[in-house]
Regions:
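Membrane-embedded transmembrane alpha-helical bundles that form the catalytic cores
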Residues: 1-408, 416-458
């Protein structure tokens, strides 16, 4: 089940919200949310609920053992074992096929990736690390810990919420009209982003995948660049929005990343929860930036190798991660001062270009295809500059491209603020009217079967 399924939109979500609203006791609310979350997770493949529960139990009991240990060496060994078990589960389901390919092992073994495994594993690891470092006490209530890991608002594709950020909200949260209203706005924005922008860009991308002209390849890369933003930020908006229906308040996962003026700035704005996870639980424990230059360089490559590998079992993802590691090192040691002196439009264009190149690695099925695509973008290997298909797609979807580019910036937010300041309540009524119309259009697309699964659903 995903957020754009009709059964979720018209049955699962309304029923869970209405039932939770009727219950005043937060303990009973939590039990109900656990039931709904496990049902949500079981919908696509019930057998993996067993894996989820076993994973929860392992980390639940391990945390008590960690706190009980006074001997630092024993405690550290227990931490290593706990992390190893979590990573083994993740690795078995996500990387076995990749490893077998590397070792040239022939097998018909097909291992399906459990939904949200990468996300809930990182949530559990954050809990173990928080307990180990003394940021949090072990959660004695198994219901609360299960809710933290399995809450259906974030288990599929995040955001990755650290335990210490959600701990108080598990037992101390309120449901208000303001939360419902802001949650509805955010959920609606996410649905519109996904169905009316990401899915339409997905169609453009699918049509252009075999195009061999320079213009066609540029349109291919740009359509993917915009699609993945609206797809994933749309999901994140829906997740954060619906979480507010139940009193949870999660931090934004995106902050207009395509307005960034450096690669470092881009990663402050893109998939923020993942960036913060790697910063808090890998980069800083490795020494952060308070170390010598060679160790710093090593740590950057470790972090970005892991970031790439987390995204998928393919050399293209690893190369994508290392590519960003190299760019961040270049900016830190050579380009930072130069970028700061450049006019913002120039540094913005630089950032968009290097990010676009990164998405070419990310979207390609293999490294050969990635470099072939990059070659065609500068005319190497392209059959022509612009063939008929590329011209037709540009002409037919020009408005979509322009609209998507504008909406990926802060233009809409600024217009909304200006209009509200000028017209107050009239602006609110008009905005809601537009939202309702667009939501009806979204539902029509979904009913017609012209929507696609979320891209990050595969990660």
């Amino acid at each position: 089940m995903v957020f754009t399924d009709l059964i979720f939109l018209f049955c699962f979500l309304p029923i869970s919200v209405l039932l939770t609203k009727q219950i005043r006791n937060i303990k009973l609310q939590n039990i109900l949310l656990v039931v709904f979350s496990l049902l949500f997770y079981a919908w696509s493949n019930p057998i993996y609920v067993v894996l989820l529960i076993l994973s929860i139990l392992w980390n639940y009991f391990t945390a008590f053992e960690l706190e009980a240990q006074d001997d630092k060496k024993t405690k550290r060994i227990l931490l290593i074992v706990s992390v190893a078990v979590n990573l083994f589960i993740l690795g078995f389901y996500k990387y076995t096929g990749f490893l077998m390919d590397i070792l040239h092992i022939q097998s018909n073994l097909k291992i399906a990736l459990p939904v949200g495994l990468s996300f809930f594993t990182f949530s559990e690891l954050s809990y173990i690390f928080d307990v180990y470092n003394g940021k949090s006490k072990p959660q004695k209530n198994i219901i609360l810990f299960t809710l933290y890991v399995s809450f259906f608002g974030k288990i599929s594709m995040g955001p990755i919420v650290s335990y210490h950020e959600m701990e108080d909200q598990l037992t101390n949260r309120t449901l208000s009209k303001a939360q419902y209203a802001s949650g509805m706005v955010l959920f609606s924005k996410g649905l519109i982003k996904k169905v009316l922008l990401a899915d339409q860009l997905s169609y453009v991308y699918s049509i252009l995948q075999n195009n061999t002209s320079t213009l066609g390849v540029w349109l291919l890369a740009i359509s993917y660049m915009l699609q993945i933003y609206f797809d994933f930020s749309g999901y994140s908006d829906m997740a954060i929005g619906l979480s507010r229906f139940f009193g949870f308040d999660f931090k934004p996962n995106f902050d207009h990343p395509y307005t960034a003026t450096s690669v470092q700035d881009f990663w402050r704005k893109w998939h923020i929860s993942l960036s913060q996870w790697f910063r808090d639980y890998l980069y800083i424990p490795l020494g952060g930036n308070r170390i010598d230059k060679n160790t710093y360089i090593r740590n950057i490559f470790i972090v970005w190798f892991c970031t790439g590998l987390w995204h998928g079992a393919n050399w293209t993802f690893i190369l994508w991660g290392l590519y960003y590691g190299c760019l961040l090192l270049l900016e830190k040691f050579y380009l930072r001062e130069k970028l700061e002196k450049l006019p913002k439009p120039i540094s913005h264009i630089y950032t968009l270009l290097v990010v676009l190149i990164g998405w070419v690695f990310f979207m390609s099925p293999n490294i050969t295809t990635a470099f072939s695509t990059l070659g065609k973008m500068i005319g190497i290997g392209a059959t022509t500059f612009a063939n008929n298909q590329a011209k037709f797609m540009l002409k037919s979807y020009f408005i979509l491209f322009v609209l998507a580019i504008l909406l990926s910036t802060k233009v809409y937010d600024r217009i909304q603020i200006f209009v509200y300041n000028q017209y107050k309540m009239k602006a609110v009524y008009t905005t809601w009217t537009i939202y309702i119309i667009l939501i009806i259009v979204c539902i029509a697309f979904i009913v017609g079967g012209t929507y696609h699964s979320f891209l990050y659903f595969a990660f």
